[in-house]
């Protein structure tokens, strides 16, 4: 946020203000010009006003005074000419004929960076101490006095918002002004005494041999105006805001001039500020204008005409403003207003109000000038509405709520990563990965295609700070070459918390698998299977839904743990699933299932199976053989140990049988259960225990 200092007496030179300094400060604040401070200096009051970036017109005394005129319903003296005590005005000599001192030449090599440049040659100047009133005025706004010539340029800067610069003309080689790009290796000592090495591309003001100023930022010491100066070249120009901003950042110098150029100066103000400064120098410093040069003239943008309906504005603001009052407010702010029909105007914004583009902007102008504090308080009308939620958003919400309910903690990581993080995670960087053109750091220059590297980094951070037990997840976007999808990544490690009649125990892969199955069941996803890849890779299982791969689940390898600096011996279980893939098959409709009116009966099955037989195949066969009677199926235990041959697993599966129409007898259940056992032995070659 930038601040603009202006004195109460300076405002009164433009506007006949009747309010006290304190009350005027309150009115300015209520009109959007927040007064940060008000202090009395040498018998005058000085306001320090916050200036928003889209209001460069407030960076001038005239701009502030114009606002004061609007909010106090007072005339703005735009054509005011300062009378300088004890100084007899001299007529400006506009001679342009060939004379010995008429040797100024101006050329612009980069017209895009400098679309308009004025140079006035003023001779016979006597640079001396400024009069007391000028020194006092500059001091009140935080500027120190240098000499009368420089002080006049600073005064016009603060009054018009147009930066000016005075060169000692006799120190310009060949009497030339050339606006060009710097050449690599050129150097310039600035007015602050600091030497800068100029990089190629920096916009400079140069004479025939060397740079004499950095355009729009600061002049050079070699051509500054001193007490020995007799002839000056007065500069007023318009520079491209982006060029000035880049230049100021490159050399590390920000000045009052560069700040205004960065926010774009008013084109008509370029000449207005120049003429005012020229007249004052001729009046106060004994100078004579002998030649005025101009290079370029930017095309004026087409003035945008805005149709403004006062009735609509009044309805929005809930205030009573007459057509005459509204037009007067806009006119005092510099707008051109034409009547079209009753309470409808055609409004044209002035050149210094580039922020006004639509009717709502004009409504704001009227509200500010009317006074925000005068707008009555009203109770807003509350209308019932329903917010549409997409299926992807609903699945994301359900997944997040379920994982939190199961004890997982959500983490949020950066969406940017690096090749190093992929390598540490043993993940190959996919071809076509999106990379930033101008990254702030090489550690964060790739758009992630997986959540796992960031989760691994999070695990490393926590484990190495004595937090070995964690259950974390992240739901976030990942980025393919041409599309953006949503994934959920989960990490699980350490000991499972103690439960009723159960002690702590280490987490297993099946805890994570169970969490995923709970998620799939909550989303009513059908047709999912966990398949062990052949040959076995880093992932223990790949997750397929209707034949399409949707994710993976596995154990972090020791090599990956070492690369991430993870020193715990316990396994870290990892999973990543595409929620976008789940969204294509999920069913979020809630279906009411009535409470069974008949009792159910549970039976357990214990079998020996090889590692190559997936549980999904066993489950599918049981559901097929017990169709119509099976109410629930759950894997109660998976055991590998002394009593189980190597390469095999002992599974205990709990089955719940029941009927919606009658109570099943033992004979009926035994028949169905025997059919299931027969299928497990004959079709899957399992061994019953």
What label would you give each PLM region?
Residues 5-8, 22-26, 331-335, 355, ...:
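A carboxyl-terminal module marker
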Residues 34-38, 75, 283-296, 338, ...:
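Short beta-strand elements
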Residues 2-372, 376-392, 397:
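RNA/tRNA-interacting regions in translation and RNA-turnover enzymes
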Residues 11, 277, 313, 490, ...:
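Residue-level signal for inorganic ion chemistry
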Residues 260-276, 489, 495-498, 502-523:
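A conserved active-site cap/scaffold subdomain adjacent to cofactor or substrate pockets
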Residues 30, 46, 63, 67, ...:
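Extended, well-folded interaction surfaces typified by the phenylalanyl-tRNA synthetase beta subunit core
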Residues 46, 437, 468-503, 545, ...:
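Polyanion/phosphate-binding surface patch
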Residues 74, 80-81, 100, 208-245, ...:
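Conserved alpha/beta core surface patches that mediate binding of polyanionic ligands
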């Amino acid at each position: 946020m930038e601040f603009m200092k202006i004195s109460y007496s300076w405002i009164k030179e433009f506007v006949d203000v009747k309010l006290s300094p304190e009350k005027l400060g309150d009115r300015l604040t209520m009109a959007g010009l927040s007064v940060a401070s008000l202090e009395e200096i040498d018998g005058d009051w000085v306001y320090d006003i916050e200036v928003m970036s889209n209001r460069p017109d407030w960076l001038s005394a005239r701009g502030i005074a114009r606002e004061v005129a609007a909010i106090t319903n007072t005339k703005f003296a735009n054509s005011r000419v300062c009378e300088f005590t004890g100084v007899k005005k001299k007529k400006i000599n506009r001679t342009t004929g060939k004379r010995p001192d008429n040797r100024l030449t101006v050329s612009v090599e980069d017209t895009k960076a400098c679309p308009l440049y004025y140079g006035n040659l003023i001779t016979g100047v006597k640079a001396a101490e400024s009069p007391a009133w000028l020194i006092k005025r500059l001091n009140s706004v935080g500027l120190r006095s240098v000499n009368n010539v420089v002080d006049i340029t600073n005064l016009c800067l603060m009054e018009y918002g147009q930066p000016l610069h005075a060169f000692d003309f006799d120190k310009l080689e060949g009497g030339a002004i050339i606006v060009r790009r710097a050449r690599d290796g050129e150097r310039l000592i600035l007015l602050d005494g600091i030497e800068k090495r100029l990089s190629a591309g920096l916009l400079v003001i140069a004479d025939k041999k060397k740079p004499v100023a950095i355009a729009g930022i600061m002049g050079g010491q070699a051509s500054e105006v001193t007490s020995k100066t007799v002839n000056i070249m007065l500069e007023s120009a318009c520079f491209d805001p982006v060029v000035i901003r880049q230049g100021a950042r490159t050399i590390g110098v920000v000045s009052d001039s560069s700040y205004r150029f960065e926010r774009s100066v008013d084109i008509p103000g370029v000449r207005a500020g120049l003429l005012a400064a020229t007249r004052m120098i001729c009046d106060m410093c004994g100078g004579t204008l002998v030649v005025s040069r101009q290079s370029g003239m930017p095309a004026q943008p087409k003035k945008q005409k805005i149709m403004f309906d006062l009735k609509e504005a009044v309805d929005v603001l809930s205030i009573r403003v007459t057509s005459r009052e509204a037009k007067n407010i806009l006119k005092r702010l510099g707008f051109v207003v034409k009547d079209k029909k009753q309470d409808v105007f055609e409004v044209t914004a002035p050149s210094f109000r580039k922020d006004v583009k639509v009717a709502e902007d004009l409504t704001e102008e009227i509200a500010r000038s009317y006074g925000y504090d005068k707008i009555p308080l009203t109770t807003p009308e509350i209308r019932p509405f329903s917010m549409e939620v997409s299926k992807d958003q609903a699945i994301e919400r359900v997944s997040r709520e379920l994982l939190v309910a199961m004890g997982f903690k959500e983490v949020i990581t950066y969406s940017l990563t690096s090749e190093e993080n992929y390598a540490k995670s043993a993940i190959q960087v996919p071809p076509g990965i999106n990379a930033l053109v101008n990254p702030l750091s090489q550690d964060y220059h790739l758009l992630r295609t997986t959540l796992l590297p960031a989760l691994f980094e999070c695990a490393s951070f926590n484990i190495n700070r004595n937090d070995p037990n964690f259950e974390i997840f992240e739901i976030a976007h990942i980025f393919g070459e041409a599309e953006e999808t949503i994934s959920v990544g989960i990490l699980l490690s350490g000991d499972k918390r103690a439960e009723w009649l159960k002690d702590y125990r280490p987490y297993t892969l099946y805890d994570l698998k169970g969490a995923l199955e709970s998620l799939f069941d909550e989303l009513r996803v059908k047709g999912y299977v966990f398949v062990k890849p052949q040959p076995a890779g880093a992932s223990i299982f790949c997750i397929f839904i209707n034949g399409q791969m949707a994710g993976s689940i596995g154990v972090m390898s020791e090599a990956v743990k070492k690369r991430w600096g993870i020193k715990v011996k316990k396994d870290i279980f990892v999973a990543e699933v595409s929620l976008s893939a789940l969204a294509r098959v999920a069913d979020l409709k809630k279906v009411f299932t009535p409470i069974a009116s008949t009792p159910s009966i549970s039976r357990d099955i214990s079998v020996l199976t090889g590692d190559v037989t997936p549980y999904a195949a066993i489950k599918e066969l049981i559901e097929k053989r017990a169709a119509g009677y099976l109410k629930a199926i759950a894997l109660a235990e998976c055991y590998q140990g002394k009593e189980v041959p190597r390469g095999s697993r002992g599974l205990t599966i709990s089955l719940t049988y029941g009927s919606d129409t009658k109570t099943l007898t033992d004979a009926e259940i035994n028949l169905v259960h025997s059919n299931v056992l027969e299928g497990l032995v004959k079709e899957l070659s399992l061994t019953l225990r």
